[in-house]
Amino acid sequence: MIKVSDVCFSYTNNMDQLVLKNINVVFEKGKYYAILGHNGSGKSTFSKILSGIFKPQKGSIEVDGVLLNKENLTKIRKKIGIIFQNPDNQFVGATVEDDIAFSLENINEDPKKMSQIIANLAAKVQMESYLDREPQFLSGGQKQKVAIASVLALNPEIIIFDEITSMLDPRGKYDVVKILDDLRKDKTKTLISITHNMNEAILADEIIVFANGGIIAQGDPKLILNDKNIIEKAKIDSPFIYKISSALKLVSPTYDENELLEQLWKLKQKTS
């Protein structure tokens, strides 16, 4: 579990120029959280604070009851894996196989087990046919798959995904979101995704909405993303299924919008 209490952050150390203002939130073990917000809302800064890259000027973060500070940073970082928007700087191996192996070596995995673990992880992200390829020559979606496999090899309790689909083409986005959903169903890790991708966000157990450095909403995706006031205040786009629902309401004011929305929601979950 991650507990964030009254966190404030400023890039200038000026408390009158806060990027994050009094953030309070709890991330429960085994849940999938999507963090939404407009550019400059503070969500990406928040992800870097969670991973220990930035230190807040005020407030505290606890991971499984251990305070995130200088003394505990190394211990806590072993529990956290992070995947960035551009994974190129995360690759350390000459091949996909080497990159995954490097993560296993970091956790002192038994060398006799490594080949099978690498094969299993590559299959999990649909990259088993690319183990001998150089990561830098892969497509954007393939690179993100390798980054996910390498982080999974570290076996962290918490994984932070920082805008990992924002630079991908539609096929790449679909593949990566499918992997995230498989991880969500597994429920063994806490997943925190900073995203603009609504197809990704609607699969979360909870959505947290940032605006102007603060949290303005948190809860069930169906309720949050169908609230026009929240959507407008956060300056984010409505998911496609809600746009369909709203359009049909204009065509036929008598139809039951909530019933159709529920049907669309179930269809989305079945096809994801």
Curated annotation (Swiss-Prot):
Residues 2-237 form the ABC transporter domain. It is found in: Cell membrane. InterPro entries: AAA+_ATPase, ABC_transporter-like_ATP-bd, ABC_transporter-like_CS, ABC_transpr_CbiO/EcfA_su, ECF_ABC_transporter_ATP-bd, EcfA_1, P-loop_NTPase. PROSITE patterns: ABC_TRANSPORTER_1, ABC_TRANSPORTER_2, CBIO. It comes from the Bacteria. Its main location: membrane. It holds the Pfam family ABC_tran. GO terms for molecular function: ATP binding; ATP hydrolysis activity; ATPase-coupled transmembrane transporter activity. It is a peripheral membrane protein. ATP-binding (A) component of a common energy-coupling factor (ECF) ABC-transporter complex. Unlike classic ABC transporters this ECF transporter provides the energy necessary to transport a number of different substrates. This is Energy-coupling factor transporter ATP-binding protein EcfA1. It comes from Mesomycoplasma hyopneumoniae (strain J / ATCC 25934 / NCTC 10110).
